[in-house]
Each structure stands twice: as structure tokens, then as C-alpha cells.
Amino acid sequence: MAYVSMKQMLETGVHFGHQTRRWNPKMRPFIFGARNGIHIIDLQQTVKMFRVAHDKVVDTVANGGRVMFIGTKRQAQEAVATEAGRAGQFYVTNRWMGGTLTNFFTIQKSIDRLKKLEAMFADGTVNRYQKKEILRLQREMDKLLATLGGIKDMDKLPQLAFVIDPHREDIAIKECRKLGIPIVAVTDTNCDPDLIDFVIPGNDDAIRAIKLFVAAIADACLEGDALRKERKGQDAEEELKKASEPKAAEAAAE
């Protein structure tokens, strides 16, 4: 079980919040003080709260749930796509399409269209069209891939959302809350922590800080998946043992 240490947080600037004039007073309990007009986040709390969030992620995946990583700001896009992909989880990095969760049936139609276009290019069907039409289809596929590529294999809603900058991702937060999907979020000093189920007080702007948290949550997903597989193997062994017991009893009776 790998948690993020305070040393790692200090090295990546997790403790630097926003300018004091841009704060949300609800974040007061998580602020250590201010320096040169910048709020300093209390990392002792961040360390503890990250552990709670980490364990929630592990437990969710261990029980067969899926996590959606959400981070559309420029600093987060690469890390979110890379780490969510490594962990085999869903992600959104380009822009949040309204209704991605609350109107998933409609979004699914766009996903089906994306898969159809990918199949056409993969098997050469697209070559039946004229060059101009092929270029149009390529642009359509690229646009859909940029928006939906991270959720194209999502056949049901995620059981947990992990968000970088809930202030920016306000529409995604509203959809999760409406559907009762628990939210883990890296929450800077300008955010409303009341909207988040598992708050991780921290810098949501610095690339190194973002990478630290995103990689750690991806590791938590992988840890949960390993536990799920281990339990599944144990259950299979137990079933096999139960199935063999009657046969052993019959053999003994003979």
C-alpha cells in the first residue's frame, strides 16, 4: 500500500495554494497560513486525507467498481490520460460534454459512432469513399476520439470519480452529485470542499503536484484490481474444493 509522503508533497509544491484574495473561506480548515500573498496548505491534513481517499479508491476497484479520472486543464491532460490508461480506468481530458454521465444514453450513441468510424479505418472500408469524404470522416473521428476516447469502452456509469480542480470541473461535479457518484478531488484553496466526498487539499495547478496525485491514484486502482483478482482466485478455489467434497465422500463410502 503506497501512500504519498509529506516529503514528496513538499518537493512537488502541493502546499502552495492560490492567492489569498482568490480563496474560498470554506477551505479555511485546510490552510496553514499565508506567505507573500499565497495561501499555504496544511500538508499534515493532506497526508491524512489522501490516505482516506486512496483507500476508498482501492476498495472501490477491489469490489469491481470503475473510476473515472477527470482533468481537462492543460496541466493535467497528459498525466490523466497516461495514468488512467495505465490503470485501465476511464478518463476525460479534452472537455467535459454536458450529460456525459446524466445523459449517458445519448453519449453512448456518439461512442457507437466513434467505434464504427474506427472499424471503417481499421478494415479499409473507408477506402470506398472519395478522398474528400475520407478526410471528413477522419476529422469526425479525431474530434470524437479527443472528446470520448477515454470513455469509449464505458458501458455503465463509474462507481467513483477522481477530479483535478473541482472548481473548473463544476459541471462534472454536479453530474456526479446528481447521480450519487462519490467524488475524490485534489481541492485547491479556491474550491468548495462541501461538494467533495473525499477532499485532498492541495495544489491543482502545478504539473508536478498533479502528476504526483494522479500517479498515486492510478497505483491505488491497480492495487484494488490486484485484490479483486486475488479474491476471485480464492473464490474459485473454494468452489472447486466444495465441488470435490461430495466426490471424495462417495469414493470413501465405496
Swiss-Prot record:
One of the GO biological process terms: translation
Q: Where is the composition biased (Basic and acidic residues)?
A: 228-248
Cross-referenced CDD domains, in alphabetical order? RPS2
Coding gene?
Answer: rpsB
The species is Nitratidesulfovibrio vulgaris (strain ATCC 29579 / DSM 644 / CCUG 34227 / NCIMB 8303 / VKM B-1760 / Hildenborough) (Desulfovibrio vulgaris)
Location of the region described as Disordered in the Swiss-Prot/TrEMBL record: 228-254
Q: Does the keyword Ribosomal protein apply?
A: yes
Q: Which SUPFAM superfamilies does the entry link to? A: Ribosomal protein S2 (SSF52313)
Q: What is this protein called?
A: Small ribosomal subunit protein uS2
Pfam families per the UniProt record, alphabetical: Ribosomal_S2
Q: Please give the GO cellular component terms listed in this UniProt entry.
A: cytosolic small ribosomal subunit
Keywords assigned: Ribonucleoprotein, Ribosomal protein
> Is Ribonucleoprotein included in the keywords of this UniProt record?
yes
What GO MF annotations does this protein's record show? structural constituent of ribosome
PANTHER family reported for this sequence:
30S RIBOSOMAL PROTEIN S2 PROKARYOTIC AND ORGANELLAR (PTHR12534), SMALL RIBOSOMAL SUBUNIT PROTEIN US2M (PTHR12534:SF0)
Q: Which family does it belong to?
A: Belongs to the universal ribosomal protein uS2 family.
Q: Which HAMAP family match?
A: Ribosomal_uS2_B (MF_00291_B)
Name the source's superkingdom: Bacteria
